[in-house]
Each structure stands twice: as structure tokens, then as C-alpha cells.
Regions:
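Mid-domain alpha/beta scaffold segments of enzyme catalytic cores
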Residues: 1-257
Length: 257
């Protein structure tokens, strides 16, 4: 019953990056039972492209934001895009102290600006944090945690999960939850209340086992969900239903859209 190939289940991929092959990828996702996808902006150009794609697909929504890698380019033009009907969140925004592609001062400033935007607009905030847990929590505590906040591609353990959940945030689990070495992450999933969990692919990155190392796509989100269900000790169908409902509620989507 818990086979991830069950096509009677519907899933919601709440974080992906759709590229030039988006039409084919979206079509395959629908066949695989994916009822919706949030296509995430990482800079001004990418956010504009995400909006354009979402306008032509009723089951695709966009976010607008500046990824920490792109923080050196600033925030120009971002706020103006938030009013589009297809835009459901600010982000992905945050801190990446692993790569440091942008100076940390600029990362911090751009993250703070996006937390403030989410609060001003009463919009969800999508967070990217890597090797910067304490700094990320500190920024949120200073600016105020938006009422709807998600830690995308959550990679922490039980302690980090508690710190996120304690701030009212949701955790979004990616294909990493299927990786052999990810015991700490599975422990975090087991500790996460079902109403605070979402699933994502982060396509085209982080393909779940057995596709690891190849291009990822939203059609594979069921593999992520099955691994989360196993970690939680819950039925896959229950996790599919709950994470989809959580995503629609989090992003403010109508149930019939």
C-alpha cells in the first residue's frame, strides 16, 4: 500500500525551479498525480519568468525573491512584482554561508528586506538557509517571523526543527530525506507535526533515490512524500493529503483552483 508509484494519490510540490523544459516537466507532473507546483524565483529575471509561466498554467504558482547567492545584485524591482495574481510568496530568501557567492553583509541586508516585505504584505516567506542557522534565526527574531514562514529544503536535525517550529514555521522536506546518510533529517521529520510539514522536489536539484544524481522534476515528489511518511510512521495517503492541504493553506490557494 505504501508504494510511491501509487497514482491514486495527489501531491503538491511546494518548491521547484522550472526551466526551459517546463512544458514537458509540468505535463509529466500532472500524469504523476501532482496537483500543484510553486515555481520559485531566485532573482529579478527568474522571478519574472516564474510569473510568466504561472500565468499560462492554472496549477503553477510563482514566488518572487532574491536567493542569497544573488544578494549582491540587490532588491531592485522585486517589490513591484509581488502584486501579480500568480505570486504566492516572497523568496526564496535567506543566508548561505556554505558558498558565500554574495558577501555576508549583503546577504543579511537582502534577507532582512525580504522578511520585512513578507510582513508588510502579509505574504508567506520561503527561507533558504545553509550553514547559517543561528544567523537565520537571529534575523527572523529581529524583523519578526512572518505568520506564514517555511524553511524550504529543511536539512536540520531535531534541534533545528524545534527552533523552526517554535517560531511558528513549517518545514519543507526534499529528496535529501531519501538519502542514506540523512538519519538526522528523518528524525526531524518524525518529530514534525503533520500539519506543519510540506514536501518539495527543489527541481532540478536533489533528485530523490533512485534518481539521485540525475535531473529532478516535480513528478518525483511522491518519492519524497513516501520517505517522509516512512520517517513519521504514517500512511502515505495521509501524508499526501495533509501536505497538499498544508501547501494550499500556506500559500493561500483556493481548494478548487
Amino acid at each position: 500500500q505504501n508504494s510511491p508509484e501509487r497514482v491514486d494519490l495527489t501531491w503538491f510540490d511546494n518548491h521547484c525551479h522550472l526551466g526551459d523544459d517546463a512544458e514537458d516537466v509540468i505535463a509529466r507532473a500532472r500524469v504523476a498525480g501532482v496537483s500543484g507546483m510553486v515555481n520559485v524565483g531566485t532573482d529579478l529575471e527568474g522571478s519574472r519568468a516564474a510569473i510568466a509561466l504561472a500565468r499560462s498554467h492554472p496549477d503553477v504558482w510563482a514566488t518572487v525573491g532574491v536567493h542569497p547567492h544573488e544578494a549582491r545584485h540587490g532588491m531592485d524591482g522585486i517589490a513591484e512584482l509581488l502584486g501579480d495574481d500568480t505570486v504566492v510568496a516572497v523568496g526564496e530568501a535567506g543566508l548561505d554561508h556554505h558558498y558565500d557567492f554574495s558577501p555576508r553583509r549583503q546577504q543579511a541586508d537582502v534577507f532582512a528586506a525580504q522578511i520585512a516585505l513578507a510582513n508588510e504584505r502579509s505574504m508567506p516567506l520561503v527561507i533558504h538557509t545553509r550553514e547559517a542557522w543561528e544567523e537565520t534565526f537571529a534575523a527572523l527574531d529581529v524583523e519578526g517571523v512572518p505568520a506564514r514562514t517555511v524553511f524550504h529544503c529543511f536539512t536540520g536535525g531535531v534541534d533545528e526543527a524545534g527552533a523552526c517550529l517554535g517560531r511558528g514555521a513549517l518545514l519543507s522536506f526534499s529528496g535529501i530525506v531519501t538519502f542514506g546518510a540523512a538519519d538526522d533529517l528523518r528524525a526531524a521529520a518524525a518529530a514534525c507535526p503533520l500539519d506543519r510539514a510540506m514536501v518539495e522536489t527543489d527541481s532540478p536539484y536533489l533528485a530523490p533515490v533512485p534518481h539521485r544524481g540525475r535531473a529532478n522534476e516535480p513528478a518525483y515528489v511522491a518519492l519524497v512524500g513516501a520517505a517522509v511518511a516512512a520517517a513519521m510512521g504514517r500512511d502515505v495517503a495521509e501524508v499526501a493529503t495533509a501536505t497538499s492541504a498544508n501547501a494550499r493553506r500556506f500559500y493561500g490557494l483556493d481548494q478548487d483552483s
